[in-house]
UniProtKB/Swiss-Prot annotation:
Family matches, as InterPro entries: ArlH, KaiC-like_dom, P-loop_NTPase
Cited function: Component of the archaellum.
This protein's name: Archaeal flagellar ATP-binding protein FlaH
Organism: Methanococcus voltae
Residues that hold ATP according to the record: S35, K37, S38, I39, Q61, K193
Molecular-function annotations in GO: ATP binding; metal ion binding
The UniProt record lists the keyword Acetylation: no
NCBIfam families: PRK08533.1
Cellular location(s): Archaeal flagellum
Family: Belongs to the FlaH family.
Keywords of this entry: Archaeal flagellum, ATP-binding, Magnesium, Metal-binding, Nucleotide-binding
């Protein structure tokens, strides 16, 4: 089994995730709004790029300019990766208010070859994109397709807000994934913290921490709390 490196010198995220991410993985990151899904996706995308993997990032959250500014604020510098083509950023931000265009996103996502030419493919936020046509049959087709893509030594990452999908569809997405992470926020000592709980991790490279408590610091990105509270 081969593993993609996710190590950055300034944080310990890679240690919490077992030292690396197995190739052929499908990573499901689930949580409500502002629970930390996107920052985890951004942290993973940056470390993949820093370790010489190419990456497609399909986003409902930000325009290209907004994404670059957000990453820069966290010192996740991606400008050169965009310019040299290692990072393909695809903003679908305008589509989230256009239901007509959203209706066939599942079909479009399986026929847009450019998405899958990179080593890593990230959808943030997948539930927003498929909420209008997320029947069990269509989602089953999508996950079968993503499994075929991942089997070619690629890694698929997607985030979802479970409130945007039916319970049956959320269960299908969790079941199809090789790694499931649930994010949430909580108050501790008067401060708001984020947590990422690994509830499923197939083919882990090594021991991993089931609950990672972290905060987001400007100029640093994710800062793992040493004294984690589960």
């Amino acid at each position: 089994m081969k593993y993609a490196k996710i190590e950055l010198e300034r944080d310990d995220v890679h240690k919490r995730f077992g030292g690396g991410i197995p190739l052929c993985s499908i990573i499901h990151i689930e949580g409500e709004e502002s629970s930390g899904k996107s920052i985890l996706s951004q942290r993973l995308s940056y470390c993949f790029l820093q370790n010489s993997y190419s990456l497609s990032y399909i986003s409902t959250q930000s325009t290209t300019t907004e994404f670059v500014k957000q990453m820069t604020s966290l010192k996740y510098m991606i400008n050169k990766k965009l310019l040299n083509g290692n990072l393909l950023y695809i903003p679908v931000y305008p589509l989230i208010s256009d239901n007509t265009q959203k209706d066939d996103f599942i079909k479009k996502s399986m026929t847009t070859r450019a998405f899958y030419e990179k080593d890593i493919i990230i959808f943030d936020c997948l539930s927003t994109l498929i909420s209008n046509d997320a029947s069990e049959v269509q989602v089953g087709d999508l996950m079968s397709f993503l499994k075929r893509i991942a089997s070619m030594n690629k890694i698929i990452v997607y985030t979802i807000n479970p409130k945007e999908l039916s319970d049956q569809v959320v269960t299908m997405l969790r079941t199809a994934a090789t790694m499931v992470i649930k994010t949430e926020t909580f108050s501790f000592g008067g401060n708001l913290k984020n947590s990422a709980k690994i509830v499923k991790y197939n083919m882990a490279a090594g021991p991993f921490q089931k609950v990672m408590v972290f905060r987001v610091d400007p100029g640093l990105g994710i800062a793992v709390e040493i004294s984690s509270v589960a």
